[in-house]
Amino acid sequence: MSSILIKNGLVVDTEWMRHYDILISGSKIQRVAPSIDYSTLPHDTTVVRADGLCVLPGIIDAHTHYHLVSRGTVTADSFEEGSRLAAYGGVTTVVDFADDNKVSLLDSLHQRRKEMVPMAIDYALHQGVYKYRPDIKKELESIKRAGIGTLKIFTTYKDVGYLVDDREELKTIFKDAKDLGLMVSVHCEDDKIVTELSSSWKGQYRPIDHAALRPAEAEAAAIEYVGGIAAELDMPVYIVHLSSRKGLESVRKLRMQGVKVIVETTPHYLFLTKEKLEGPEGPLYVMTPPLRTEDDNEALQEALVNGEI
């Protein structure tokens, strides 16, 4: 395989920025130095002049939903299109999700990997677990052997079969994951709160109402629920797409109790507010959890800067 020499770029590392040359061979960085002599390299080495440009490590996006099939529709980006767009934006690795929608978790994983063949960048998968099985530990063992390191659990969406609503069954899944060295990540919204609000709702179902029907209190309650299970088992828990100050306060409360809570958020919860749900373009901003307030934006931004997220 031919080599690539990136010349005189401003290389950005965690602690420093310097003008360096980078030699890449076999898709791996072989050497980083102030100056690499082209004449010492194979004759077919490609030289990329990076004068005046920054050279950064590729971004890893640990939460993507390409070609997600749900409720009779599918997300806009295919694996091929989405991964090419990611590459143009500097994202070189994504971690998507295998649904729990086949006879076994391993079957679901194999099917998802077949669908991901057109990917233009590196990828991995989290495995969704949407229902309890008596042989759940054997199933988890099989997907771990197949390369899975992270599970995805929901505390909502009972109506579409994503919710393991029996606490002891959910605790068993957590314990088996701990025994096998698997991380459990959780979409946190309390389904009871969401369901009760929806069933008693007297107004219309407009995009802006989505924020009222899935409030920050639901996120906070679910975080404390799964955090309690993690505390009982002395294991970490990973909260995906944190959206609110109240949710952040629940995370802080758990951490004060000694629970290891890992948290991610997303650009839309950092910078957009529920006002985007108003008007003719409102449907384009419907997501779950919903967009919140400017106060929530500011709380998450501060937590990101200080390392809580």
Annotate each predicted stretch with a short phrase:
Residues 1-42:
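N-terminal metal-binding scaffold of metallo-dependent hydrolase/deaminase domains
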Residues 9, 22, 27, 52, ...:
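Divalent metal-coordination and catalytic microenvironments
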Residues 37-56:
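Active-site metal-binding motif and surrounding structural segment of the metallo-beta-lactamase
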Residues 51-118:
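Metal-associated gating/positioning segment near the N- to mid-region
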Residues 75-83, 133-143:
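Short, acidic/polar
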Residues 94-96, 124-127, 236-241:
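Short catalytic-loop micro-motif centered on adjacent basic/acidic residues
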Residues 115-129:
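A glycine-rich helix N-cap at a beta->alpha junction
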Residues 135-309:
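Histidine/acidic residue-rich metal-binding segments in metalloenzymes
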